[in-house]
């Protein structure tokens, strides 16, 4: 455990904004904040990829994580990112993409765009619930990693809360971590879902150091509602968490809010909080 107070406090309620910040004298801050574009998928569909990415950049975001390309080619995505001073370190894909016949072409397109990671985004209910299913998913990630690594990319896995449902003496997340250990496969930890599951992120970072290059930064109002909130509007102690970022190897911080009433207001509020936040 991370020096008991910081580890336990990372996902516990804060005593207020001041308690979640370090003194300004020797404080660190996030210098390159990203956003998962699923948060603004409605705008991507209605207003277009180009105008949406331009607006994202105007808010101060410098990195984006894709969840679909909305009919644009890899070259079009690459050029739009460049025009707006953005980069896209990673992309989310469904399980079926990993075993699709055109996966090598997808990897080539991802490299054209500039992605470094291809992250398995989610498992549908029929794809969960047994040791055998998670072992199969680990094997799919391992096979995909061979294809991705040949093009200079890395496979990753993005968690929700269901991976932590007990499966005898283990759980799905443990199976994925252990089965892919040493393979090059990495993990994108979602802080909201870790909070819902009641899990301590840093305990995993310590057990698998350097294996979590990306995190989803989204807040949780806390039990009993577990309502998703803009960053800084919930119970997660972000300063305590970010202070341990190097343990997990975290370098990319993606704001996300799955279904906000106003997506733009949500990611604007999250950006404002993260720009103010200081930590050690």
Predicted regions span which residues?
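N-terminal export signals
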Residues: 1-20
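Active-site acidic/histidine proton-transfer and metal-coordination neighborhood
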Residues: 63, 70, 87-89, 95-187, ...
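Conserved, mostly hydrophobic/aromatic
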Residues: 35, 56, 64, 81, ...
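Glycine-rich, proline-tolerant flexible connector loops at the mouths of alpha/beta enzymes
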Residues: 65-82
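C-terminal segment of N-terminal export signals and the immediately downstream linker at the start
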Residues: 14-38, 42-46
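C-terminal helical cap(s) of enzyme catalytic domains, especially alpha/beta-barrels
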Residues: 264-280
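A general structural detector for well-ordered alpha-helical segments in enzyme core domains, enriched
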Residues: 51-55, 76-80, 102-109, 133, ...
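Gly/Pro-rich active-site loop or hairpin
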Residues: 41, 52-53, 62, 164-170, ...
């Amino acid at each position: 455990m991370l020096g008991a107070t910081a580890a336990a406090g990372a996902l516990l309620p804060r005593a207020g904004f001041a308690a979640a910040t370090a003194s300004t004298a020797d404080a660190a801050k996030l210098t390159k904040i990203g956003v998962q574009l699923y948060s603004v998928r409605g705008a991507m569909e209605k207003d277009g990829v180009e105008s949406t990415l331009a607006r994202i950049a105007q808010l101060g975001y410098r990195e984006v994580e894709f969840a679909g390309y909305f009919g644009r080619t890899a070259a079009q995505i690459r050029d739009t990112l460049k025009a707006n001073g953005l980069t896209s370190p990673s992309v989310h894909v469904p399980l079926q993409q990993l075993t699709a016949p055109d996966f090598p072409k997808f990897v080539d397109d991802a490299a054209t765009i500039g992605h470094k990671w291809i992250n398995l985004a989610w498992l549908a209910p029929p794809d969960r619930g047994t040791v055998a299913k998670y072992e199969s998913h680990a094997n799919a990630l391992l096979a995909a990693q061979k294809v991705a690594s040949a093009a200079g990319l890395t496979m990753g896995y993005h968690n929700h809360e269901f991976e932590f449902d007990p499966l005898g003496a283990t759980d799905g997340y443990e199976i994925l971590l252990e089965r892919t250990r040493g393979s090059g496969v990495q993990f994108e930890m979602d802080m909201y879902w870790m909070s819902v599951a009641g899990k301590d992120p840093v305990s995993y970072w310590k057990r698998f150091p350097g294996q979590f290059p990306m995190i989803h930064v989204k807040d949780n109002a806390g039990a009993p509602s577990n309502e998703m909130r803009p960053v800084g509007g919930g119970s997660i102690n972000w300063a305590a968490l970010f202070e341990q970022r190097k343990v997990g190897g975290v370098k990319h911080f993606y704001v996300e809010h799955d279904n906000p009433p106003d997506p733009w207001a949500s990611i604007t509020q999250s950006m404002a909080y993260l720009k103010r936040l200081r930590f050690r």
